[in-house]
Structures are given as structure tokens and as C-alpha cells.
């Protein structure tokens, strides 16, 4: 029977579970445990001799180390980079100098480190405590040492041991490591950093600091009966030998950490968690050779902090740190997550998830802890709001960050990855919704309290302070700059919670102009809060009244109708004061100075735009500078906030408040700004400009403001740069710039416009105000250009209408009356600005304005007359007339425009509103403006007409004359549309120009007429057109679709039967 081979001095058969080494002399195999050779040491042995062979061949020899790289096998001749943690690296690290930690580390006593201190000053910098007294921390006696750790924890407990030289880890029993620690001949540098003993007997003699127990999420908010176990990160024992080194790292979950040195000493290398440093850290950690690069060389500053025996160090969330142990050391530490640095914790957690690096001190179930904290935040906010108390700003900011993380974790594409850490019996969607609601309520209350503090500061100003008119323009222009809400902390790691509550008494000192530009970034919040108090205000009582009104709105959101009435009555009382005129004049002067100084240096807008902006400055100053610093806004299921009063039409609370936009560049929004799913209240710092404007409503108190200022009778307007409050620009503040002229105002004295007709042929005639035989008064506009008159006569002949005054004579008189009552604001786009070229030469023809009271009565009468005359006009039976409910964004003929979708120019819209407008003062002219639709249409018509007539009607002499006429008319029209200033020959009026450039708006009218285009031939009547057709082709049988003049013109000009001009 064959025998089993045996090996080693123990003469046992081969065991696959035991490490064995071969002797180079006798070629026999020996167990490592029998001959005293560890498995980790074997790669370093060059020639091994067993105990028997050592007597004859000598001792074993080790490989010569050519480099301190962990990948080096000793066989390659090249020199590799120094490995982090190697002996050469430790020697170099000890000799280097680093900036002192005095700049960043805060030194306190144990009794000073309280929850109130951290809430006021934040926890953004490391805190060093010299003695443990006052910390509420329990530590063993100074005689406690490593052997006692083994007795309390157990000798057979497996621990993770880090080989510092190679920066690798392996498992080892605690007894074996303690034997290594006490041995005099240490062949390696081993380090134990993750011995967690919260469940061991040693937990009874070691207690974390009291401040940690108060802040820790796991200690306070994790239920004891939860299925998912608590993360065991609160109590660690660190047993480190001399020259132990832990490379740069961020604690898992972005946790903060505390260290207490019981014996020995530790050196910390600290790096601030700025955005740049975090990006560098992520790039460094993800590189394959990061263990060969010292990360401190890549950042601006790395601080060195020495922690001696008996001292305690608290390191905040996100700080990148490395640890060197210069002497044998026994220390205790613990990790904790808290509400003071939620933003940084989330950022660090995201970095950790992207890197996917296994850590020896993981923070398991971090997301579960966040869910429990979110539930706590909801209960906390509800309780505080019921008690009419305000949660701390850092708590509100933390709740916003957590709720944003909840949303990303519960998205459909990310739910599978995160659902394992979702607590049982948790309804995430309901929690997100309820928490968002409480956050918004808290933010609104915070804004109200901030405005009340600003009011107190204004009242505390000395009575002999300078009036607002004498302050420099820079102080007034400051509120237009973006201002961050006081309750939101900075996205960067620089003390987000500091300097928020205090400093209101110092606000009166802020208006010193030389010191304002020198405010540093750290003091922005204080300075911006100060600037709110410098807004020109002569009567603090008005501001207090508005703020009390805003507070009532917050407390009684279930009574919107009552609040609207009280709000309006308060605002009316504020504005009906005798010295309002003087105040508005001063504000207007400030706006002018502010605009000039602002763009003089920035040079970001041309002068022409500045002049246009100045026309609306006065109206906006009534709200932005008088007494309204904050307002509340609702949008369609997206919650935003604004510095100005801004509401949408679907809001139930502020339905009567005008939506006013600021015309200034909008800064980038806060990266953690929260937008809710419900239409509820929130303050938005930087409102977003929207394309679609809601229907505007006027303030009742704005109309009251206008009345005391405007004179009762004013024969003509002054040609000054600054407009008086009764000009059309003031009144047209509430008219949308997107050609929507419907204005609604319950409390306004201006009557409601019921909309114009969808423009057809007669609307074009109304726009041009041209019918034969009309007498124009001195105040009216001059007649249309000859080319336009001919085109209109052609359209009349097509529609079988006579050139008479029956339809349009009353309209002209009505439109003149309407110009006195309704101000139709010209478009703010540059395309509509070309009409101002001729206006500067004849400012005396500007119509005088009537008072609002008389205009409301006249406009209603004139509107009824329009209805009667327009209904008597001709309607084409083949044309479908749309209703007045159609809007520009949803055109009725949208489904019919399927043939030509790739045209360069938009076809003429039947719903466009073209009407006469009062010229605005000093608007910039557009040089060389052209309209492609008119030019291409006329050119195509001329080319086709000439081509057909040359082939078919060569015998007729009249055909030879049509070609130059058509070409001349097309050139004339294109020249008229592009010329910035009207010439005496053309005598083109403003309405003609606005139609040709596509920016006109329609005046009154209820029935849409048949759409048409400019024609190049004048056809006086339908009878003459038929005679003309018969004379041209007397004997030939005409083709189908070319029998009548209307059909031929339609073919030539490519008029589709539904009325669109197809090019």
C-alpha cells in the first residue's frame, strides 16, 4: 500500500490551508508556522535555508531593496518612485515644513464647545481641545495600554491590519498583533485603525464627547427597532506603532471625526474641502499610481497639526486628512454625521460613490440615516410652526439638501440602486412632498423676520440722516445686484452658518460709499443685509405697514379674498400722501444717475437700449425702491421667489397683484435651490425670465399714484428726456411686450380692451388709415405711401369693395380717440424701433393725453361704433373666420401650414394685430431693415408675370409696359420697408412702416376680415378689373383657375385659398 508523503520537521502530510516554504539547500518543504516564517515575509527572502541547513549553508539571505515601491520584486534595474508609507517616504515627510495649523484650527476649552456655539459659528474648521475636562467624555486611566485592549475586546477577534510600507491590509487576530506590538524586533510597520468596540466590554469605559452624542444622527434619530442595523462607527480604537502612516482620505459618508490621544502623539495633515481641492482629490484617488504621489504637493496649502497626549481634535465634514504617528500611540476616535454640514456630507458621499473605493472604516447605510433624519426634520418643522417659532437657518438648508437627495434617489432610473437602504414602512413620496411644504413655510417666515430686522434698523437711524437724493448713485444701484437670501448658507465650505443672526445694530454704518466695494466674500451676507436698509425711505411707517401686510398673508393663507382687499387698502393709504410727488421726482433722478453710472463702466449695453430702458424705470422704481423689498410668488407648480412683486394668474392668494419683471441680467441660480412640485410659496432670489407672460393686472395704488402727479390739463408734451408720469409709456407699463394687448384690472380705472380682430384686408386698411377722400387733422398721421395705396386699392378690387369712406371713415376717428384713452406700447424688440427715425423731427405731432377718467368712458363708446361699422364690411364666404380666443402661441391655422415648413420667413399670421400706435420718443432706428416675405413675394410675382406675358401676350403692346412697372413697384416697396426715415415723397406713416417690418399691433375690432397681401397694381373697382381682364385677353379661352383677376393674382402671388401667403 502506498504511503502518504510527509513534510517539514513535524512530519505531517501536506495541508492546503497552511503556508509552506521550500529550502533551497535540501529541497524539502516546511510549514511557515513551524520554522517561524510569515507568509508576508516570504517574497522578501532571496535564499531560504531551513533550520537544519543553516548549520552547514548559513542563514537565509534577503533581497536587496533597490526602490521603495510596493510593486518592486528586486529583479528590475530601474528606480521607481518612492512609495507612500515607505521608510524613505516617512523620512522625507518628517523633514518637510508645512504651514502651521494656527490659521485654520480653532482652539477652545471643553466647556466652550457647546451646541449653541456651533449653531452660531458653524462647524467648518477643525477644533482643538487641550484637555478633556468639560467635554463630557469618558476615557480609561493613563495606565490603560494595548494589553488591556486585548483583555476587554478578546484575543481571538479578527482585526484589519495595515502594512504601512505597502499600504495594503490583511486580517490578523488581535492576540497576534499585540504580540507584534510588544516585540523588540519589528520587521514591518503594522497599524490597526478600525477596531470598532461599541458592542464589546470596553464600550463601558470609553464614552464619546457629549457634543458628538447631541449632534449624531445615528445616536438620536435611528430607531432601536429598525430592521436595518445602526452603523457601527461611533467608537474606534487605534493602535499605531512608530512611523505608521495613513494616506490622504475623506471619511466615509462625509462624516466628521473626533480623535483623543490616550498615549503617544499623532500628526495630522489637513486640507480644506474647497471645490478645487475636492476635484483634485477625486482625480488623484482615481489614478492607478496614487500611492506614488504625495497629494499635498497638488494643492495650495496643507496644514500640519500635532495632537499630543490628552488632547482632543474635531475634524469637520469633508476635510482631506492624512495621519502620521511619530511614536507608538494608543488613541480613540469616532465618526458622526450631523445637521451642521449636510451639504458637505452629501458632496463627500457622492465623491465616495463615484470613486468606489473600499474603506476600512465604512459608514454603512448612510442613506438610511438620511431618511430617518428627513422624517425627524418634518416632525420638527411641524412642531415649530405650530408653536409659531422659526427653525434655525442651518436646519432649513440641511432639509433642502436632504430632500433634494431623496428626489434623486427615488427616480425611476436610480431606484434599484438605492431601494436597499430605504427604511421599512417609509413612504418616500409623501415624505418628500410634506417636507418640501414645511421648508417653504420656514423660508417665508425667515424672510419676514429678516425684513422686520431691516425695518428696526431703519427706524434706529438718526433723524438728521441725509435725504435719499444726496446719497451717491452707487448706494442706490446696489439693490439691483443679485442678493442671496439670508437663510441659505453658502454652497462653498466657508462658514455657511456664521454671521446670520447677529449684526443688525451695525446696519446704519453700511452706507459709507468708499467701503462698500471692499467687502470681502466672507462678509457678503452682512453687507447685503445692510444694503437693504439703505433704500431711500422717508417714512419707515410705510415699510412697516407693507411688512405687516405680508406677515398677515403668511398667517392667513386660507383667506385670499380678504387679504387682497386689506393689502390693496394698505397700499392705497401708503401712496396717497401729499409729499409723494417730491419723492417720485427724486427716485426718478436716482434711476437716471444709476443707469448712467452702471453702464458707463460695464459698457454692456448700447445707448439706444439704455434710453428705452429709462422709459420704464420710473414705474418700476415705485415698487422696487419705495417700500417693497420682498414679495412672494407662485408659478404653475414650480415654486420660485423674487425680490420684486411677481405673481402668476393662477395664484389664489395674490391674484390681483401685477407681475412686474426686472430688466437686468440674471445671475446663475443657487446650485442647491429647491423647486417644488406644488404651487406653494417660496422666495426666489433671482427670478427667471419667461417667454410667455401671464395676463397682467394693474395695482389700484398705482393709478392713485398717477393722479396726484399728472396735471389736469396739459396742452402739449415737453420734449425732455425724462418722461412725465402721464405719458403713454407710463400707462403702457402693464401691456405685454409679446403683442398681447389684453389688459385686465379689477381695481384699475382703465377699461378692459376686448381684443382686436384677426387681421384681414380691412385690418390692413385700418392699420394704414388710408381710404380715398379722408381728411386728416393736424393731430393725425399722414396718409400712406403711394405704393401702399395702390396695393390697398388692388385688394379692394379683389374683395369687390368700392374705395369709399363707408367702412373706414368712422374707424379712423375712433382710432384717434382710442389713442387718447388706450396706450398701446410699441414692441421692445429692435425690429420695432425703426419707426423712431422720423419721430425726432416732428415731436409736435404727438397727441396730447386725456385723463384716465374720461378715457375710460370714451373708449367704450368708440368701441361700440367700431363693432357696428366693421360688421357692415364685406366677408369672404370661402374664408373661415377664427374666433378672438386664439393666441399667438396656439394659432388656429396651425394645422393648415403643413405644405411649407422649411421656409426662411414666417408666413403672414391672420391673428397678428396690426394697428396705429403713438410714436415713442427717441427710439433707435434700424438701418437697412428688410422683410423677406414682401420682397420675395413681389419679386416672384414680377418675374412670373413678365415671363407669362412675354410668351403668351407678345402681340399686345401693353404687356411690354407691365414689366418695368412691376419691377419699379417692387423696388419701391422694398426700399420703403428698409429705409429708417420717411422721405417727403413717400409720406409713409407709422402704421405702414410697422406692417412692413412685422411689429405692428391691431387696434380695436371684433370681426376678422379676409387676409390679404400687398399688391403692386392699383385696381379702383371691381368693374374696372373685369374690363381690364377682358381687354388683355379678348379672344382666348382662359385656363382653369385663371378666369378672374382674383384667381390670377392668387396664382401669381401664391395665395393659398385659406388666406396664407406661401413663399
UniProtKB/Swiss-Prot annotation:
ZnF endpoints (PHD-type): 5-56
Name of protein: Lysine-specific demethylase phf2
Compartment list: Nucleus, Nucleolus; Chromosome, Centromere, Kinetochore
tRNA-binding listed as a keyword: no
Keywords assigned: Activator, Centromere, Chromatin regulator, Chromosome, Dioxygenase, Iron, Kinetochore, Metal-binding, Nucleus, Oxidoreductase, Phosphoprotein, Transcription, Transcription regulation, Zinc, Zinc-finger
Organism: Danio rerio
PANTHER family per record: PHD/F-BOX CONTAINING PROTEIN (PTHR23123)
GO biological process, one term: protein demethylation
Record PTM Phosphoserine, positions in chain: 1021
Ranges annotated as biased composition (Polar residues): 776-791
Stated role: Lysine demethylase that demethylates both histones and non-histone proteins. Mediates demethylation of dimethylated 'Lys-9' of histone H3 (H3K9me2). Recruited to trimethylated 'Lys-4' of histone H3 (H3K4me3) at rDNA promoters and promotes expression of rDNA.
Region (Disordered): 448-546, 704-761, 773-864, 879-1045
Biased composition (Basic and acidic residues): 513-540, 723-745, 920-929, 965-975
GO molecular function: histone demethylase activity; histone H3K4me3 reader activity; histone H3K9 demethylase activity; histone H4K20 demethylase activity; iron ion binding; transcription coactivator activity; transcription coregulator activity; zinc ion binding
Biased composition (Low complexity): 460-477, 813-833, 976-988, 1021-1031
Amino acids binding 2-oxoglutarate: 246, 259, 266
Amino acid at each position: 500500500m502506498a504511503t502518504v508523503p510527509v513534510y517539514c520537521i513535524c512530519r505531517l502530510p501536506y495541508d492546503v490551508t497552511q503556508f509552506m516554504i521550500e529550502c533551497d539547500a535540501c529541497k524539502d518543504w516546511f510549514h511557515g508556522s513551524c520554522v517561524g516564517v510569515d507568509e508576508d515575509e516570504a517574497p522578501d527572502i532571496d535564499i531560504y535555508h531551513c533550520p537544519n541547513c543553516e548549520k552547514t549553508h548559513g542563514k537565509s539571505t534577503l533581497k536587496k531593496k533597490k526602490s521603495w515601491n510596493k510593486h518592486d520584486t528586486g529583479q528590475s534595474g530601474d528606480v521607481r518612485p518612492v512609495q507612500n508609507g515607505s521608510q524613505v517616504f516617512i523620512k522625507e515627510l518628517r523633514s518637510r515644513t508645512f504651514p502651521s495649523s494656527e490659521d485654520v484650527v480653532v482652539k477652545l476649552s471643553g466647556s466652550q464647545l457647546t451646541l449653541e456655539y456651533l449653531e452660531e459659528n458653524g462647524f467648518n474648521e477643525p477644533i482643538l481641545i487641550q484637555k478633556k475636562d468639560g467635554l463630557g467624555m469618558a476615557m480609561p486611566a493613563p495606565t490603560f495600554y494595548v494589553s488591556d485592549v486585548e483583555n476587554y475586546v478578546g484575543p481571538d477577534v479578527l482585526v484589519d491590519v495595515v502594512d504601512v510600507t505597502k499600504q495594503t491590509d490583511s486580517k490578523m487576530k488581535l492576540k497576534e498583533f499585540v504580540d507584534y506590538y510588544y516585540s523588540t524586533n519589528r520587521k514591518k510597520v503594522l497599524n490597526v485603525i478600525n477596531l470598532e468596540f461599541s458592542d464589546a466590554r470596553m464600550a463601558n469605559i470609553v464614552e464619546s464627547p457629549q457634543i458628538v452624542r447631541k449632534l449624531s444622527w445615528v445616536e438620536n434619530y435611528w430607531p432601536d427597532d429598525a430592521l436595518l442595523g445602526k452603523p457601527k462607527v461611533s467608537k474606534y480604537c487605534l493602535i499605531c506603532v512608530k512611523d505608521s502612516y495613513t494616506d490622504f482620505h475623506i471619511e466615509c459618508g462625509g462624516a466628521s471625526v473626533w480623535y483623543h490621544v490616550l498615549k503617544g502623539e499623532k500628526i495630522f495633515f489637513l486640507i480644506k474641502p474647497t471645490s478645487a481641492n475636492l476635484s483634485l482629490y477625486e482625480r488623484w484617488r482615481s489614478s492607478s499610481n496614487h500611492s506614488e504621489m504625495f497629494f499635498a504637493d497638488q494643492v495650495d496649502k496643507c496644514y500640519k497639526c500635532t495632537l499630543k497626549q490628552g488632547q482632543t481634535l474635531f475634524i469637520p465634514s469633508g476635510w482631506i486628512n492624512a495621519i502620521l504617528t511619530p511614536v507608538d500611540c494608543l488613541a480613540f476616535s469616532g465618526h458622526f454625521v450631523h445637521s451642521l454640514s449636510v451639504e458637505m456630507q452629501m458632496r463627500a458621499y457622492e465623491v465616495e460613490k463615484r470613486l468606489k473605493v473600499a474603506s476600512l472604516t465604512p459608514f454603512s447605510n448612510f442613506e438610511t440615516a438620511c431618511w430617518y433624519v428627513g422624517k425627524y426634520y418634518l416632525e420638527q418643522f411641524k412642531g415649530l410652526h405650530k408653536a409659531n417659532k422659526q427653525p434655525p437657518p442651518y436646519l432649513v438648508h440641511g432639509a433642502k439638501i436632504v430632500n433634494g437627495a431623496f428626489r434623486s434617489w427615488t427616480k425611476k432610473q436610480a431606484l434599484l440602486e438605492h431601494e436597499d437602504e430605504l427604511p421599512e414602512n417609509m413612504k418616500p413620496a409623501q415624505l418628500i412632498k410634506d417636507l418640501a411644504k414645511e421648508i417653504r413655510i420656514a423660508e417665508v417666515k425667515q424672510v419676514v423676520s429678516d425684513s422686520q430686522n431691516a425695518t428696526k434698523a431703519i427706524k434706529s437711524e438718526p433723524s438728521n440722516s441725509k435725504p435719499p437724493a444726496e446719497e451717491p448713485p452707487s448706494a442706490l444701484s446696489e439693490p439691483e445686484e443679485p442678493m442671496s437670501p439670508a437663510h441659505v448658507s453658502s454652497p462653498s465650505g466657508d462658514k455657511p452658518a456664521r454671521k446670520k443672526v447677529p449684526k443688525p445694530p451695525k446696519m446704519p454704518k453700511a452706507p459709507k460709499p468708499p467701503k462698500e466695494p471692499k467687502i470681502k466674500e466672507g462678509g457678503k451676507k452682512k453687507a447685503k443685509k445692510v444694503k437693504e436698509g439703505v433704500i431711500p425711505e422717508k417714512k419707515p411707517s410705510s415699510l412697516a405697514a407693507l411688512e405687516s401686510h405680508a406677515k398677515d398673508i403668511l398667517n392667513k393663507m386660507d383667506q385670499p379674498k380678504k387679504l387682497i382687499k386689506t393689502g390693496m387698502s394698505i397700499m392705497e393709504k401708503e401712496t396717497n400722501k401729499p409729499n409723494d410727488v417730491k419723492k417720485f421726482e427724486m427716485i426718478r433722478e436716482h434711476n437716471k444717475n444709476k443707469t448712467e453710472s452702471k453702464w458707463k463702466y460695464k459698457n454692456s449695453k448700447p445707448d439706444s437700449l439704455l434710453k428705452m430702458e429709462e422709459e420704464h424705470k420710473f414705474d418700476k422704481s415705485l415698487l422696487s425702491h419705495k417700500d417693497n423689498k420682498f414679495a412672494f410668488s407662485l408659478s404653475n407648480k414650480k415654486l420660485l421667489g423674487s425680490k420684486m412683486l411677481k405673481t402668476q394668474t393662477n395664484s389664489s392668494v395674490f391674484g390681483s397683484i401685477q407681475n412686474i419683471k426686472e430688466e437686468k441680467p440674471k445671475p446663475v441660480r443657487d446650485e442647491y435651490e429647491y423647486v417644488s412640485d406644488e404651487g406653494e410659496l417660496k422666495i426666489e432670489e433671482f427670478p427667471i425670465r419667461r417667454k410667455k407672460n401671464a395676463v397682467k393686472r394693474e395695482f389700484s395704488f398705482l393709478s392713485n399714484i398717477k393722479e396726484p402727479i399728472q396735471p389736469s390739463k396739459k396742452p402739449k408734451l415737453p420734449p425732455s428726456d425724462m418722461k412725465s408720469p402721464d405719458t403713454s409709456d407710463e400707462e403702457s407699463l402693464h401691456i405685454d411686450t409679446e403683442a398681447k394687448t389684453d389688459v385686465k384690472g379689477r381695481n384699475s380705472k382703465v377699461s378692459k380692451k376686448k381684443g382686436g380682430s384677426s387681421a384681414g384686408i380691412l385690418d390692413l386698411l385700418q392699420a394704414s388709415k388710408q381710404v380715398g377722400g379722408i381728411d386728416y387733422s393736424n393731430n393725425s398721421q399722414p396718409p400712406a405711401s403711394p405704393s401702399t395705396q395702390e396695393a390697398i386699392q388692388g385688394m379692394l378690387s379683389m374683395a369687390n369693395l368700392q374705395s369709399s369712406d363707408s367702412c373706414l371713415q368712422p374707424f379712423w376717428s375712433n382710432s384717434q380717440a382710442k389713442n387718447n384713452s388706450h396706450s398701446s406700447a410699441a414692441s421692445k424688440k429692435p425690429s420695432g424701433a425703426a419707426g423712431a427715425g422720423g419721430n425726432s423731427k416732428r415731436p409736435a405731432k404727438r397727441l396730447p393725453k386725456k385723463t384716465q377718467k374720461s378715457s375710460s368712458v370714451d373708449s367704450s363708446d368708440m368701441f361700440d361704433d367700431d363693432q357696428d361699422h366693421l360688421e357692415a364690411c364685406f366677408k369672404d364666404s370661402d374664408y373661415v373666420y377664427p374666433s378672438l380666443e386664439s393666441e399667438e402661441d396656439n394659432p388656429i391655422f396651425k394645422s393648415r401650414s403643413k405644405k411649407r415648413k422649411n421656409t426662411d420667413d414666417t408666413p403672414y399670421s391672420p391673428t397678428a394685430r396690426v394697428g396705429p400706435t403713438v410714436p415713442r420718443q427717441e427710439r433707435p432706428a434700424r438701418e437697412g431693415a428688410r422683410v423677406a416675405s414682401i420682397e420675395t413675394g413681389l419679386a416672384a410675382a414680377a418675374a412670373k408675370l413678365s415671363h407669362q406675358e412675354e410668351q403668351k401676350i407678345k402681340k399686345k403692346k401693353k404687356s411690354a409696359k407691365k414689366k418695368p412697372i412691376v419691377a419699379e413697384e417692387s423696388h419701391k416697396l422694398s426700399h420703403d420697408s428698409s429705409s429708417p426715415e420717411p422721405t417727403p415723397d413717400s409720406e409713409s406713416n407709422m402704421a405702414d412702416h410697422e406692417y412692413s417690418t412685422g411689429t405692428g399691433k391691431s387696434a380695436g375690432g371684433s370681426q376678422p376680415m379676409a387676409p390679404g397681401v400687398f399688391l403692386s397694381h392699383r385696381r379702383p373697382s371691381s368693374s374696372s378689373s373685369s374690363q381690364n381682364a377682358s381687354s388683355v385677353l379678348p379672344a382666348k379661352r382662359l385656363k382653369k383657375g385663371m378666369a378672374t383677376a382674383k384667381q390670377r393674382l392668387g396664382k401669381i402671388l401664391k395665395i393659398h385659398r385659406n388666406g396664407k401667403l406661401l413663399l
